[in-house]
Amino acid sequence: MLTIIGCGNLNRNDDAVGVIIAQRLQQYLAQNPHPNIRVFDSGTAGMEVMFQARGSKKLIILDASCTGSDAGAIFKVPGKELELLPEPSYNLHDFRWDHALTAGRKIFGDDFPQDVTVYLIEAANLDLGLELSPVVQHSADLVFAELMTIIQQNVMT
């Protein structure tokens, strides 16, 4: 099972990029369903990520980043690298998807995906608003195309 989860805040411009990509994938899969592919819009609910990922073989997380890199930069990060980060506090008010990776592995063990990839797109504008900036929209289109290839490969297997 492949699970793709989009994260972000739809009311903060580029922060919505992960959710917007996930919604596009959901529209595609509504027309072209496949029983071994699930796509979720988790918004800002990190706890949902942990439960939605459970039972999957492969997990892909989509989100915006704010690292100081060039706007629109795409980072493809193996989940294992993110699990090496310091132990989170697990405060439920601050529980994010990166906490879900660590907690999910501890709680669910082998029932949590071993193969995790995180796509991050560097934001240009995180102010309140409903639009992706042009450079982030372009990067979202590139990530969407790559994910469509991954979906097609999973459909064929």
Predicted regions and their residues:
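N-terminal catalytic or cofactor-binding beta/alpha core of small enzyme domains
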Residues: 1-114, 118-123, 130-141, 150-157
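Hydrophobic "lid"/C-terminal helical patch
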Residues: 147
